[in-house]
Amino acid sequence: MTDSVELEPAAAAQLFGDRLPIARTFTANLASQGEERGLIGPLELPRLWSRHILNSAIVAPLLRPGVVGDVGSGAGLPGLVLAIARPDVSFVLIEPMDRRVIWLNEQVAELGLLNVDIVRARAEDAKLAKPLDQVTARAVSAFRKLLPLTAPLLRDGGELVLMKGAAAQAEIDGAAKEISKFKVRGAEVIVLGEGVLDEVTRVIRATVR
C-alpha cells in the first residue's frame, strides 16, 4: 500500500537535481514493495522521504570521486540513494542477505545505475578487487563494533563516512581501544541538513592510516 506514503518534500529537488526522477522511481518501488519484501516496516511509509531517502542523500557532498563501499546496504539506504545522487562516484554495495541482494540487483537494473556493483557477503568476508576510498554505513552497529568491519576495507588514507544518531560523539568516546587498534585518525561528528531537512543527519567521519 502506498496511500500513506509521505509526499515528496521540496528539499528532494535540491538534493537530487536532475537525478530526481530516478530517486522518485526508487522511492516508489520501496514504498510499494519494501514492506512485503521485509526491507522496511509499515511505520516507515509516512516518513520514507524525510527519514530515509533525504536522510541518506544529504551525505552525498561528503563523497569524493573514487570507489565507495556501503556496508550492510539492505534496502539500498544509503548506498543506492547515494549512487543516484552521485553518478560520478563508483559504489560497491556489500550485503549478506540473499533476498536483499536480489532487490538491490533489481533496482540497479531498473534504475539504470551504471556506477554500482553488488557483493553478496558479510563485510568481514568481502573479497574486493582493491581497497576502497571511502566506506559508508547506516544503522548497522555502534562505532566501536563497526570499525572492525569497515576500517580493513579502506586503503591507507581512506575515509569512514558513517551515518549515526544523536549519540554519535558518545560512540566515538567509547571506541578509544578500537580507534587505536585500527589506526583511525581525526574522528569527528558532522551535522548535515540544518535548515534543509526536518531532522538533521549526523555522520562520523574519520581517516584510517
UniProtKB/Swiss-Prot annotation:
Keywords: Cytoplasm, Methyltransferase, rRNA processing, S-adenosyl-L-methionine, Transferase. It is an enzyme of class 2 (transferase). Its main location: cytoplasm. GO terms for molecular function: rRNA (guanine-N7-)-methyltransferase activity. S-adenosyl-L-methionine binds at residues 72, 77, 123-124, 138. GO terms for cellular component: cytosol. It is found in: Cytoplasm. InterPro entries: rRNA_ssu_MeTfrase_G (IPR003682), SAM-dependent_MTases_sf (IPR029063). Transmembrane segments: none annotated. The keyword Iron does not apply. Its EC number is 2.1.1.-. Specifically methylates the N7 position of guanine in position 518 of 16S rRNA. HAMAP family: 16SrRNA_methyltr_G. Belongs to the methyltransferase superfamily. RNA methyltransferase RsmG family. This is Ribosomal RNA small subunit methyltransferase G. It comes from Leifsonia xyli subsp. xyli (strain CTCB07).
